[in-house]
Amino acid sequence: MRLSALDARPLLIPFTTRFAHASAARSETASLWVTVTTSEGVTGQGESCPRPYVTGESVESAAAFVGRHRDELAATVHDMASLEAWEARHAAAIDAAPAAWCALELAILDALGRTAGVTLETLLGLPPLAGAFQYTAVIGDGDLAHFEAQWARYRAAGFRDVKLKVSGDLERDVPKLAALADAGVRVRLDANNLWPNAEAALAYLTALPRPIFALEEPLAPGAFAALAGVAARLDTPIVLDESATRVAHLRDLPGPPDRWIVNVRVSKMGGVRRAVAVVRAARAAGHRVIVGAQVGETSLLTRAALPVAAAAGPALVAMEGAFGTLLLARDVCDPPLMFGAGGRLVVADHPRLASPGLGVA
């Protein structure tokens, strides 16, 4: 395969509803879309969701990364071996711009798979997808009326696992948690780095109705010792999201391994291959895994996350995303790749998953 063109552009798709949490609020996608074209006329598509508060990237900086490396990639990447070699040579640059590399990697993998007539899983040396994937209901930090409307839809659809974005305001958050407790569903909280220190976090968290399954990122990213203290005080696992964007971040985490759950999102990890590597490192260390999603992902990133979830095996405790046109005014493929009844995405219901490359755009 020879790459003849690599192009990057912003992807702007309106949301069907506004989504908010402690770090941001948005009403449309903020994504990078990369298209590669081979000399044989085969195209590949890639997507990522650069976020300043996750990896320090923006759509503009990610597009600039593509521009800086376009010519070298076209000249040197022709197959899986050369793609892996390029990534190894540029590891430090990718560490600093993982979302930018994610969109590039996915587009190249898509083109490689389409050229060879094989699926993403075959390219990665992974088993074919099978069975079903179970997704979580994710509820943003809206007012109580907005929460009630969202939860009513999720509950009617049969969801039994919920991730709730919290505000840090007990009057705002406690009624939501009470409603979820009454429903008997499993609940985890996402604080999006809300509190400045463990004492402030615990003052709020110890006043909440219990139990909760897990707590995501209550403090500044990378505050592992303080996070371990919060986990011990609450007897609740901590979900690492912004604190874990590559394998190195999992080394020497303090305390018992079951105190940590790693949220693996393809975009922030730097693509599907790096995401699988993080999953394998987490499993080897005894940590559990959530395969997460950035708000506003299209079906392409949903597709890319499936082999990552499959690689997690019994360590997988939850999945996020696959909202398709429930959140997006339109998706990149029709029908979109999204969960169905009960939050399940059944592989057999989506024949395009067996198509060459990513098979969705």
Task: Enumerate the predicted regions with their spans.
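Residues at the N-termini of beta-strands
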Residues: 5, 161, 214, 261, ...
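Metal- or metallocofactor-binding catalytic centers and their adjacent structured scaffolds
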Residues: 37-39, 43-115
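Active-site beta->alpha loop and helix N-cap motifs at the rims of alpha/beta catalytic domains
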Residues: 114, 118, 139-156, 170-174
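N-terminal small/glycine-rich loop or linker at the start of catalytic domains
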Residues: 116-141
